[in-house]
């Protein structure tokens, strides 16, 4: 049976309109013919507020959309054609899955009658993203034109329900379209405005049970992992209330979103944990969210003999890679704090907290001395200096690998609150620049701190510059590639370390930036960093790059020297 191209457009428009009525505000569109009806529909709906961005690389587009979602927690849709285009969405879907971020992946497909018969660009794409997605949803096998508006509304409701549930995450909508695909718009009426729809009930974790065996009157430690959806004002208020009740010190990951807030945080715990036997004795640990990056912290938690309770925010999946937690509550910190008996911190808890804070203060003073704004650039010194020199109104994204680890160990306290972003879910370096561009598009400004290999891995991320309405500033730490492997216990003497692990590249980041019309500047000495950052943050350009050249072998030695210091010897015993 033949169909009219307008029928495909009608169905695509009805689906996108239904998604908009449920809260979808933006779409990232990749090129393709089979996805033509969705492209035309998205274009027609721009007049009703749909923000449309286009990108030629599906992998990059997936990460750009994920960056937008990370910025405000609202779902973003990506539209692609059929075939390998779908496979390129998998890295972003994996990160969205681990980070619990809502992402709608709309992929055009051939009708069922063209499957498994050798038809061009017809693959088993419905299976490609399924392991990483909350749900696989499909339209009619004959084509989306065969769906009524009511069925398309139910499809949209199901997609949003899965994407925004507990946990939030990516949803794959695989949509078959039959030919003809491209309608003539000249005789068609304008798209109707989307009708507001009530979002169906979201998936929620099971109810909160009785109070787990943590005693607020005994000494304890609070460990806060990287930011997740739900770590907003209610979470912070509950943490402040918990601290007033227990007095427990708070060991907060650099990307927890807490540094700079009025909380008694311990930022230098990674270095202080070099001598765990010197720590004030704790009877229990409360872990909030996923695991921080610090390996020393993980080792300490793995050998800790007291109870460890894990509390997550609408995340029912297990968040205990060390298998050391006694239980996990997925309903959030605020609900758990409400169950605590009233009271005040014990004298022992107050004394222990004071000792933690004293050690933290002395450690930060010593790091100021050990990592001055002098001499050649080093990665530990850069982490500390960037924290202090970048104005707090500029959010910072830390690329996976060395930057996030150095910021965790050496950046120290923040004088004012700053949003720090990292993607520690799958810890991939693919999509780094595109992620940052998506965040900058929503927040209007962002500083990305990245290594040279992570930047090179997402070279197509430069292409977002032309459509970027915000300001993205790149600090590229060029250490000749693979500096993170210098920090791992790899026996270098018995192998070709550079060839097998570091994999240094010859691509010039500044030349690559220039090829895309991006202004770039070089920094090789700490003395010039403040002036270089002032240039970097000047308004006007969509993107700018500052390259900081470092020596990864020398930096590896510096890190080890700092990690081996007896930090607790500077702190008087109680």
Curated annotation (Swiss-Prot):
Assigned EC number: 2.2.1.9
Free-text remark on how the cofactor is bound: Binds 1 thiamine pyrophosphate per subunit.
Position of the signal peptide: none
Pathway(s): Quinol/quinone metabolism; 1,4-dihydroxy-2-naphthoate biosynthesis; 1,4-dihydroxy-2-naphthoate from chorismate: step 2/7; Cofactor biosynthesis; phylloquinone biosynthesis
SUPFAM superfamilies from the UniProt entry: Thiamin diphosphate-binding fold (THDP-binding)
Catalytic activity: isochorismate + 2-oxoglutarate + H(+) = 5-enolpyruvoyl-6-hydroxy-2-succinyl-cyclohex-3-ene-1-carboxylate + CO2
BP terms from Gene Ontology: menaquinone biosynthetic process; phylloquinone biosynthetic process
Cofactor field: Mg(2+); Mn(2+); thiamine diphosphate
UniProt keyword annotation of Oxidoreductase present: no
InterPro entries associated with the record: MenaQ_synth_MenD (IPR004433), MenD_middle (IPR032264), THDP-binding (IPR029061), Thiamin_PyroP_enz_TPP-bd_dom (IPR012001)
Recorded superkingdom: Bacteria
Keyword terms: Magnesium, Manganese, Metal-binding, Thiamine pyrophosphate, Transferase
UniProt GO MF annotations: 2-succinyl-5-enolpyruvyl-6-hydroxy-3-cyclohexene-1-carboxylic-acid synthase activity; magnesium ion binding; manganese ion binding; thiamine pyrophosphate binding
One Pfam short name: TPP_enzyme_N
Presence of keyword Transcription: no
Family: Belongs to the TPP enzyme family. MenD subfamily.
Quaternary state and interactors: Homodimer.
Role: Catalyzes the thiamine diphosphate-dependent decarboxylation of 2-oxoglutarate and the subsequent addition of the resulting succinic semialdehyde-thiamine pyrophosphate anion to isochorismate to yield 2-succinyl-5-enolpyruvyl-6-hydroxy-3-cyclohexene-1-carboxylate (SEPHCHC).
Protein name: 2-succinyl-5-enolpyruvyl-6-hydroxy-3-cyclohexene-1-carboxylate synthase
